Amino acid sequence: MKKLLFLICFISTGVYAGGAYALYDYEQHEFQVSFNTYEVRPIASITKLFTAITILRSGAELTEKVKVQGKSGGHFPNGMMVTRHDLMKAMMVSSDNRAAETLAHTYPGGFNEFIRDANAYIRGRGLMNTSIEE
């Protein structure tokens, strides 16, 4: 019953409309059915979750103000000084892309270090076919 419920929930969230789905049996540790599971596609807002985790794991001071920067749209104008905490809220609640960009660019060690650390975390979770890129 759990498998069927999971599949129904998965389909009802619009994932099926995206052209891929999977039904995994956690007791047998195998997929019962799947479609297009290896097609490469953008992971959209899931990237923001990995961004938040990477920022929190870095120990970066969330009350520190950083300069907003980015090419994407967002709630904060470029050049504005905003705390990482407020950027995290905007990124997670409003799906603010510029907030995510700013957090990545103001990461301790810089943007390239953010990409390296985020991808190391992702690989450490066993997600070998998932990565964050610029």
Model-derived regions: residue spans:
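A general lysine-centric signal
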Residues: K2-K3, K48
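Sec-dependent N-terminal signal peptides
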Residues: K3-T13
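Active-site-adjacent loops and short helices of periplasmic peptidoglycan-processing enzymes
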Residues: Y16-E134
